[in-house]
From Swiss-Prot:
Gene3D superfamilies (alphabetical): 1.10.8.50, 30s ribosomal protein s13, domain 2 (4.10.910.10)
Protein name: Small ribosomal subunit protein uS13
Key words, A-Z: Ribonucleoprotein, Ribosomal protein, RNA-binding, rRNA-binding, tRNA-binding
Species name: Neorickettsia sennetsu (strain ATCC VR-367 / Miyayama) (Ehrlichia sennetsu)
A single BP term in Gene Ontology: translation
Function description: Located at the top of the head of the 30S subunit, it contacts several helices of the 16S rRNA. In the 70S ribosome it contacts the 23S rRNA (bridge B1a) and protein L5 of the 50S subunit (bridge B1b), connecting the 2 subunits; these bridges are implicated in subunit movement. Contacts the tRNAs in the A and P-sites.
Length: 123
């Protein structure tokens, strides 16, 4: 089912289906369902159109999600890089930002290990 520009699965509960939207996790999805008095265990196609419209309105008005949230996060990171603070420098160098060790580990952030290849001896 297409919902706010995203394909949501029909065979999952409403609470789980809402988590397919970027920026909405399980706690937020539960909060949406409880505040609108919607059964979270119901399937998405089983909901009435008014319920779907109320969920859509709630998300659009109260929660940053999808493109808006992605732009906000990207702008925040760009701002850190522009002001050249410690976190911005770490982002620019593709290193861990939150104080993790880098002598070992941090492979996901640093990328594949590059082993220098020794040059052949000339005779």
């Amino acid at each position: 089912m297409r919902f706010l520009g995203v394909n949501l699965p029909d065979n999952k509960a409403v609470v789980v289906a809402l988590t397919y939207l970027y920026g909405i996790g399980l706690p937020t999805a539960r909060k949406i369902c409880s505040s609108l008095a919607i059964d979270g265990s119901a399937k998405l196609p089983d909901l009435e159109q008014e319920q779907l419209n109320s969920i859509m309105a709630y998300i659009k008005n109260d929660i940053p999600f999808e493109g808006e949230l992605r732009k906000s996060v990207a702008f925040s990171i760009k701002h850190l890089v522009d002001i050249k603070c410690y976190r911005g420098v770490r982002h620019r160098k593709n290193l861990p930002v939150r104080g993790q060790r880098t002598r070992t580990n941090a492979r996901t952030r640093k990328g594949k290990v590059r082993v220098p290849i020794a040059a052949k001896k000339r005779v």
